[in-house]
Curated annotation (Swiss-Prot):
Positions in coiled-coil regions: none
A Pfam family recorded for this sequence: MraZ
Name assigned to this protein: Transcriptional regulator MraZ
UniProt-listed InterPro entries: MraZ, MraZ_C, MraZ_dom, MraZ_N, MraZ_sf, SpoVT-AbrB_dom, SpoVT-AbrB_sf
Cellular component aspect of the GO annotation: cytoplasm; nucleoid
GO biological process: negative regulation of DNA-templated transcription initiation
Length: 151
């Protein structure tokens, strides 16, 4: 399971140094590669190949014929998926096609989230964290009480 947030920079050639902690998890539990895809203009998702295969199967099984929003989301993820492998220095090349679709450039945060990694622009990540910390705790407690989540 991935966890933690790492402030990083994408170099001038589009390479991102993947922290050793994440590379070790990938090498130990999966293969030394990830599938990267767009989720929104704010972040890229990076899945171990085995996890991506599960997600892709679920996406392909979505009933999207009568739902253009879901169809576009399905297409966004599937059409932009690319396998990334790291070099001997532990870097992955973030493809130019993905980089041009997101609204961040060099300063990024690579976040571990259970079965995947998320690549956020640093400003977007900070804004998301500020919002999460500013959420009304009583409203959050109520919303959580409506779920099965046990913390």
């Amino acid at each position: 399971m991935f966890g933690g947030a790492h402030e990083l920079s994408i170099d001038s050639k589009g390479r991102l140094a993947v922290p050793a902690k994440f590379r070790d998890i990938l090498s130990r539990l999966y293969t030394p590669a990830v599938v990267a895809t767009l989720e929104s203009k704010h972040k890229l998702l990076m899945y171990p190949v085995a996890e991506w295969e599960k997600v892709a199967a679920q996406l392909l099984n979505l009933k999207v014929a009568d739902n253009p929003v879901l169809r576009r989301f399905q297409n966004l993820l599937l059409h932009n998926a690319e396998i990334l492998e790291w070099d001997s220095a532990g870097r992955v090349l973030v493809p130019a096609g993905l980089r041009k679709r997101v609204d961040f450039d060099r300063e990024v945060v690579l976040v571990g989230r259970a079965n995947r990694l998320e690549l956020w622009g640093r400003e977007q990540w900070e804004a998301e964290m500020v919002q999460a910390l500013d959420d009304d705790p009583d409203e959050l407690a109520f919303q959580l009480s409506q779920t099965d989540l046990q913390l």
